[in-house]
């Protein structure tokens, strides 16, 4: 079996999907998990205004609304968390995402003071953060805030990790990669777009260039520039289609380099790194 086939199997990607059916799979997955764990009553998710959090947020709110209707109680809630670093460049998109999702609650946590405090504390002991490492600090601070909110609301922190992100390891370890539950994990980027179209999402929220926007030296850096390969090629690869050898090599190199991100902490029993 080729590495491409190994990756497709590991990430559970289908070569084609029925968007309505995949919406139902994700919603039922969230509902079933909460039904199996009655002490959990909320879902918590950071909303950025991009494709992945918009889709995941809509799935979360749908699941919570159905649970309330099915149980006849108001104990379940979806909490959307705004997590800007100061002023968000695409604030209008974030507001549009919130309007589309219609979350039960919206909380806003400005992470800038916490990041600046951490940066100053480290500088005082001679550790000067690079712009890249500071970007990872932002991702981890966002996750820290979400876990605090979830902890006070009997909640799960929901992730937005999907197959096109997982294959490249394009997430921050213990930042946006550190979540409790990932309802869109098996989907690639174009499949996520298909689900949003099915859900009636405003198209500008999933047609704009994806960006993590963590680096101040390179603001709004497109994911595809950082990765050196387009999502179209990544999606083709994940659907089992033949792609240019250089693009395939780029994807597979990212996959190998970031294997540690997709695993629990390494122990003496692990040998994948050898």
From Swiss-Prot:
Binding site for Mg(2+): 52, 165
Originating gene: nadE
Name of the protein: NH(3)-dependent NAD(+) synthetase
Pathway: Cofactor biosynthesis; NAD(+) biosynthesis; NAD(+) from deamido-NAD(+) (ammonia route): step 1/1
An example Gene Ontology CC term for this record: cytoplasm
Subunit structure: Homodimer.
Protein role: Catalyzes the ATP-dependent amidation of deamido-NAD to form NAD. Uses ammonia as a nitrogen source.
Listed NCBIfam families: nadE, PRK00768.1
Organism placement in taxonomy: Bacteria, Pseudomonadati, Pseudomonadota, Gammaproteobacteria, Enterobacterales
Gene Ontology MF: a single term: glutaminase activity
UniProt EC number: 6.3.1.5
Entry-linked PANTHER family: NH 3 /GLUTAMINE-DEPENDENT NAD + SYNTHETASE (PTHR23090), NH(3)-DEPENDENT NAD(+) SYNTHETASE (PTHR23090:SF7)
């Amino acid at each position: 079996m080729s590495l491409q086939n190994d990756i497709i199997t590991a990430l559970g990607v289908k070569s084609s999907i029925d968007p309505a059916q995949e919406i139902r799979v994700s919603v039922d997955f969230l509902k079933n998990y909460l039904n199996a764990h009655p002490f959990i009553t909320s879902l918590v998710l950071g909303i950025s205004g991009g494709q992945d959090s918009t889709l995941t947020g809509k799935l979360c709110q749908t699941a919570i609304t159905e649970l309330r209707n099915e149980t006849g109680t108001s104990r379940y809630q979806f909490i959307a968390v705004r997590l800007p670093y100061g002023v968000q460049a695409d604030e209008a998109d974030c507001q549009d995402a919130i309007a589309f999702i219609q979350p039960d609650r919206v909380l806003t946590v400005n992470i800038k003071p916490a990041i600046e405090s951490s940066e100053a504390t480290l500088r005082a002991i001679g550790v000067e953060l690079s712009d890249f490492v500071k970007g990872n600090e932002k991702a981890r601070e966002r996750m820290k805030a979400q876990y605090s909110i979830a902890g006070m609301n009997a909640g799960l922190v929901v992730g937005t990790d999907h197959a096109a992100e997982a294959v490249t390891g394009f997430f921050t370890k213990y930042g946006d990669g550190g979540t409790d539950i990932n309802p869109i994990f098996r989907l690639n980027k174009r499949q996520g777009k298909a689900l949003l179209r099915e859900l009636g999402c405003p198209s500008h929220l999933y047609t704009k260039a994806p960006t993590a926007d963590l680096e101040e030296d390179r603001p709004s850096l497109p994911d595809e520039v950082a990765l050196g390969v387009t999502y179209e090629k990544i999606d083709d690869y994940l659907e089992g289609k033949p792609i240019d050898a250089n693009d395939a090599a780029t994807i597979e190199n990212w996959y190998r380099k970031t294997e540690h991100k997709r695993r629990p902490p390494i122990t003496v029993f692990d040998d994948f790194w050898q």
